Each structure stands twice: as structure tokens, then as C-alpha cells.
């Protein structure tokens, strides 16, 4: 990791000038407003950046445990490639109760909201801010909260970008971590093990220590312990991959699942991908990246975000990204040797029901008569063979 990571700047980004093709363009300054919004389950702190655009959703972010919206997302939103997106969309950052900068400790006996209740705070936030719909961007615990929100209120969510999503209830290791985290000195280590893989802890000392210091010094430890306990007490999302004629619980909106190839959440994300509608879901696995793609690989994440938004029908005039060019080229030459280096680089065939084991996993399958779903034996009625395969991208 470069030395810059030791001095991460968590200040709010307000881009004014950008150089595009040698021409300096003045951008509209962000109007940033902070609000403490009272909901049925308590007060939540939000930061609005920009003015909501007509007929466009607002990007709503939700951070992971041990973080707040600044330490979680500012590295991404301050990145130059994101400026084109934030010119088209305003952003609403949500801080989980008591996790914002300078938050006071909750009184003794305070019952911290459950993960379901944290999700149910969001409709009140959206209504009080006068928003119509959102495009969710969540990481870890925040990804879970946004997914629960989208399942309960599908009309409010146009799309989701979910990083390190774990759709399952806690396992026994999580249960043990919850008990141990009751010891104040053990809490930062438990959070670090959630955010970073073992390889990152050993090889990326500067980044890990930067966030360890932030967790210890800048986040209210009592409040953090309550948030961690709430996350480790989460219920299973109980989502299932839909098939024709079924009435399963699943996301109705497009979803982009993102995970680093060495992230501690990689297995959970692949599992989540296998449970979602493959016609609306894309799995992006980032190489040379662990649990913090928004910090370590902001260019790739911004690129993927832009492509996702374009796929939803927004920003049609935006420049084509490398990911889009890669996918377009792959689709145009699906019968060529390029299939071997397409979005199937994840090598997760043994871990995801959506994988066929072939190099070519494109939903088109136009060049493979032997593998095409239209050419399967009439005796094969298994729904798994008739279900479209989810798209995967590796970068």
C-alpha cells in the first residue's frame, strides 16, 4: 500500500474544478446539510450532499460497523471518477445511531435498534427529506440494512450496490465474537477482523493501523459495542433465487454485489449471489483487493458504479467505461477465445449454484449449441438447468 494511506483524508469532498479533455470546467458546488431525523425507532444522523434531481433517485449510503459515513465512503466520493456521477445524483449519507463524529454515549439501559429496526428508520428519513426513491450503496452491516429495507419497501429502492453483503444470520463464531466484544479492549480487534482479511492484517499494516486508530479514538466505544451486538444478532434475510411460478422472497431491483478476492466476506457474497434473481444481479470480484474496495480500489469501484447506473437507464451520455467496453467486446465475440477471460475469472464453480463450470458463463450462450438452455434434453426439467445464470465480472 502506498504511503498516502497513512494520511487518509476523511473531509467531505466538494469538487469545484475538473479538467476534462484539457478544458477546465466549473462544477456546481455541493450544498451539504446535516440533519438529526427522528423516526419511530430513534434519531438518526444524515448528511445530504447536493440537491435532489427531478426524476432521479438519491444515492443513499450506509456504512459498516466500526465506521461512519466519512471514514467509510469519503475515499470513494472524493475520487475524481466519482465526480461525474455526483454531478447527476445527490447523495444522502446515513450514520447508524451513535456512530457519527462526536456522538454522545447512549444512557444506561438504552435499547439499541435491531437490524430490522435500523432498516425501518429509512422510510422516515426518505419521507422527511422529501425524497422519492433511492439508489442504495452499503458495505457490510450497511449492505444488510439496505437489503432488508429494499425487501420491505421495494417501491422506494431503484437499485442496490452491496459490498461485502452477508445475508445469513450469525454463526457460532459471530456469537462468540459478540460475547468477547463485551470486553472493551477486545472490541477493536473484533471489528478489524470483520473489516480486513488475515492477509491484509499482516501485509497492509498502514491501512489497518489507520482504521484501528480511528475505531479506538473517533468512534464512541459504548455506542459501537451496541451496533456490533445488533449486527451479530441479525436474522437471516431468507432470500431465495426465484423461478417461474414461485413466490419467493428476493430483491425486486437490480443489484451489484461487490467483493475483493481476499475479503473475509467473499464466501458470504458468493452465497448471496446464488440466492438472488440472476437476471437482475451482477457479481463483481476485484483482484488484489480485500475488505475495503472503496479505499484500495476506488477507480474500479467508481467504474463499476457508473456502469451499473448506466444499465439502469441513467447517464446515457456518460463516457463508456473500461468495464462496459470489456463486457461489450465479450458479448460481441462470445464464440471466440475471449470467453476464457470474461466475467468467469472467479473460479467459484464449486461454491455457487449459478456457476456452470465453463469458461463461458454469459447468459447469451449463442455460440455453444451443446450448452444452450434451448438445446437441453426434454427430460431435464430441473429448474436449476432452466434458470438464467447470473452475470459475473472480474477486474
Curated annotation (Swiss-Prot):
Ranges: Sequence repeats: 339-348, 349-358, 359-368, 369-378
Alphabetical UniProt keywords: Developmental protein, Repeat
Chain segments carrying region 4 X 10 AA tandem repeats of G-[NS]-R-S-R-[AS]-H-T-[DGN]-[DES]: 339-378
Family matches, as Pfam families: Ndr
Keyword Transferase: no
UniProt xrefs under InterPro entries: AB_hydrolase_fold (IPR029058), NDRG (IPR004142)
Ranges of biased composition (kind: Polar residues): 377-389
GO BP field: pronephros development
Biased composition (Low complexity): 326-339
Domain of life: Eukaryota
Segments of skewed composition (Basic and acidic residues): 345-376
Region described as Disordered: spans on this chain: 325-395
UniProt function note: May be involved in pronephros development, after specification of the pronephros.
Family from the record: Belongs to the NDRG family.
Official protein name in the record: Protein NDRG1
UniProt source species: Xenopus tropicalis
Amino acid at each position: 500500500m502506498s504511503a498516502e494511506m497513512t494520511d487518509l483524508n476523511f473531509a467531505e469532498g466538494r469538487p469545484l474544478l475538473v479538467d476534462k479533455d484539457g478544458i477546465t470546467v466549473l462544477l456546481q458546488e455541493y450544498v451539504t446539510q446535516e440533519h438529526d431525523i427522528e423516526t419511530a425507532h430513534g434519531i438518526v444522523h444524515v448528511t445530504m450532499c447536493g440537491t435532489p434531481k427531478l426524476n432521479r433517485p438519491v444515492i443513499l449510503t450506509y456504512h459498516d460497523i466500526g465506521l461512519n459515513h466519512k471514514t467509510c465512503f469519503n475515499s470513494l466520493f472524493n475520487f475524481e471518477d466519482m465526480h461525474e456521477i455526483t454531478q447527476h445524483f445527490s447523495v444522502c449519507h446515513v450514520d447508524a445511531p451513535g456512530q457519527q463524529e462526536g456522538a454522545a454515549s447512549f444512557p444506561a439501559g438504552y435499547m439499541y435498534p435491531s437490524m430490522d429496526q435500523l432498516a425501518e428508520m429509512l422510510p422516515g428519513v426518505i419521507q422527511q427529506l422529501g425524497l422519492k426513491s433511492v439508489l442504495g450503496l452499503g458495505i457490510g452491516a450497511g449492505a444488510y440494512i439496505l437489503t432488508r429495507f429494499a425487501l420491505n419497501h421495494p417501491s422506494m429502492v431503484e437499485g442496490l450496490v452491496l459490498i461485502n453483503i452477508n445475508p445469513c444470520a450469525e454463526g457460532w463464531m459471530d456469537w462468540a465474537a459478540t460475547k468477547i466484544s463485551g470486553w472493551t479492549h477486545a472490541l477493536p480487534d473484533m471489528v478489524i477482523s470483520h473489516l480486513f482479511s488475515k492477509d491484509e492484517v499482516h501485509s497492509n499494516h498502514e491501512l489497518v493501523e489507520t482504521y484501528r486508530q480511528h475505531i479506538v479514538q473517533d468512534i464512541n466505544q459504548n455506542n459501537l459495542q451496541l451496533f456490533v451486538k445488533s449486527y451479530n444478532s441479525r436474522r437471516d434475510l431468507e432470500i431465495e433465487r426465484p423461478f417461474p411460478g414461485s413466490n419467493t422472497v428476493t430483491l425486486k431491483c437490480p443489484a451489484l454485489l461487490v467483493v475483493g478476492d481476499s475479503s473475509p466476506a467473499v464466501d458470504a457474497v458468493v452465497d448471496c449471489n446464488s440466492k438472488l434473481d440472476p437476471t437482475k444481479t451482477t457479481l463483481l470480484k476485484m483482484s488484489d483487493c480485500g475488505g475495503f474496495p472503496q479505499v484500495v480500489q476506488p477507480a474500479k469501484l467508481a467504474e463499476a458504479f457508473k456502469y451499473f447506473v448506466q444499465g439502469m437507464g441513467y447517464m446515457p451520455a456518460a463516457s463508456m467505461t473500461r468495464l462496459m467496453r470489456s463486457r461489450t467486446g465479450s458479448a460481441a465475440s462470445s464464440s471466440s477465445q475471449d470467453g476464457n477471460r470474461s466475467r468467469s475469472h472467479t473460479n467459484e464453480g464449486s461454491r455457487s449454484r449459478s456457476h456452470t463450470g465453463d469458461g463461458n458463463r454469459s447468459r447469451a450462450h449463442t455460440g455453444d449449441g451443446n450448452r444452450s438452455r434451448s438445446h437441453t434434453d426434454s427430460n431435464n426439467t430441473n429448474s436449476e438447468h432452466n434458470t438464467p445464470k447470473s452475470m459475473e465480472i472480474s477486474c
